[in-house]
From Swiss-Prot:
Name under which the protein is recorded: Protein pelota homolog
InterPro entries per the UniProt record, alphabetical: eFR1_2_sf, eRF1_1_Pelota, eRF1_3, Pelota/DOM34_N, Pelota_arc, Ribosomal_eL30-like_sf, Transl-rel_pelota
Source species of the chain: Caldivirga maquilingensis (strain ATCC 700844 / DSM 13496 / JCM 10307 / IC-167)
Family membership noted in the UniProt record: Belongs to the eukaryotic release factor 1 family. Pelota subfamily.
Gene Ontology biological process terms from the UniProt entry: nonfunctional rRNA decay; nuclear-transcribed mRNA catabolic process, no-go decay; nuclear-transcribed mRNA catabolic process, non-stop decay; ribosome disassembly; RNA surveillance
High-level lineage: Archaea, Thermoproteota, Thermoprotei, Thermoproteales, Thermoproteaceae
Cofactor: a divalent metal cation
Disulfide bonding pattern of the chain: none
Localization annotation: Cytoplasm
Amino acid sequence: MLMKINEGKNYVELTVERVEDLFILYLILKPGDLVYSWTVREVRGRSGERFGREKVYLGVRVRDLEFHEPRGVLRIRGIIEDYPEWLEGAGGSYHSLEVGIGSTLKIMRSINRDYLEQLINTLSSGIKVLIVSVSIEETTVALATRLGVSIIATISNNYIQGKESGGSLINQRYIDDVSKVVRQLTEVHKPNALIIATQGMLMSSIPDIEVKGVPVERVIVSEGGLSGIYEVERRGYLDKVGLKLGYDTVNRIMEELSKGSGLVALGDEIYEALSMGAVDSLVMLDKLLIEKAEESRRIIDDCIRTRAKLIIVPDGSEAGKLLNGLGGLAALLRFRIK
């Protein structure tokens, strides 16, 4: 469980530890909720003179929410209801709480524990994988997390001079450059695993990039560089290290659709299938959690009730591209409903 949770009789207090936790807060919070958090607010005197910005603990009645994924911030806008006595005139004023990694938020109502744990289990895989895809011309490095696969570095080969003496196809100085960057990125991102991907003819030319405490898996792909990153995802190597981004399930959905088996539900059929307990696995694009939050809450509730497996698929992933073509939501069924 990535969130630190303290439960009281009529409140739940949560500390955000990863960006994924902000998705969870976005789904939990509703307009009308009273929330408390530390924030910064400008202090003014009775005659309007400014005394600067001060850190203060405020209770804010939620009006609306705005999620900024690139910044890793959830902005909660609302009306100040509870504030320290020295902050004169704050009551009834608008204020925005910016909740990010490390922030603690107290929500003044009880929250269904099963619903909360389902969200955490679904959205908050803490696994991070560094993928290093090597070709003769360049190396592409990507970070794979629960939110998808992001390209974080490209290293060009500035030493291409034909085949190296001794039979090597890759210049050692190029490999040294790659190793240096990978070690630096490992220090920054602290991945759980490292995947080195390249063509079979190059694999013997690439020595192990040893990073203390990080297991390394070497895989052969048809092409290195950026294409190799996507091939690693498509071929299920991320699943093998525990990071499931939904490709296998989406691929099976496409196969069942092509067969006309009747074991796939799309659109409004999904709600009918959920109400009948017919859904085995449901895949949803992550962007729907933000764009259609209320609908997402209903779907998650139904998955919990019927014990359907829920998989959130990153929009920019290979599986996400396929799922986009199906409307962003699809379900594999336990049995036909028509």
